[in-house]
Amino acid sequence: MNKIYLAIIALLALTSCANTYEIKGTSNVSTLDGRMLYLKILKDNNFKSIDSCDVLHGQFHFQGNLDSVKMGNIFMDDEPVLPLVLESGDITVKLDDAQQIVSSTPLNDKLFKKKKKYQQLQNQQRELVHKHDQAIMNGSDMNVVTQKLNAEAIQLSEQEDKLITNFVTENFDNVLGAGVFFLVTMGNQYPMLSPWIEDIMSKATDNFKNDPYVKD
């Protein structure tokens, strides 16, 4: 009887550990030190705080229990700092002036691998502005330059749309699909049906369509 009791206790302990997360963060951003960070999730169409901590000597820490995997976001006051997936395990967050990375758990690794590719495309788009300004300084034919840069901008925009569309559709049935869809469209003041959104919705599963990140 005692062996059975101990086995049950051990199983409950393992189950409890399997449904917990711990976020260990580091930052070299001087303006963050001494500030309060909030861990929030979307609930009833609003971000609700589920934990908070101070950044002390470039370190911060969150932990908690999970009933299911969720998308979360770290906020400073009312400003979102970065998204992440709340899933079981030890989650590592790194904030610095050059980049923001969440790693060490499967879905976070997947999310930030794709985020890195997205940022590379955005950097290339910003570089087009530099090329335009440099061409003016060099006295180049701006009609030719503008035509070339516009073509490059269209190509980069199409690559961005394809990157997002493929990532969302590949993750229809986990939190990444709806979560990334929400992050990309949350800045829209009104509902918009751009071609890439129409493409996603035409392929979407019921699970995706009924997710609060999409439905609301």
Can you annotate each of these PLM segments?
Residues 4-14:
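Sec-dependent N-terminal signal peptides
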Residues 13-16, 208:
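Hydrophobic alpha-helical membrane-interaction elements
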Residues 169-172, 176-216:
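Charged, long alpha-helical assembly modules
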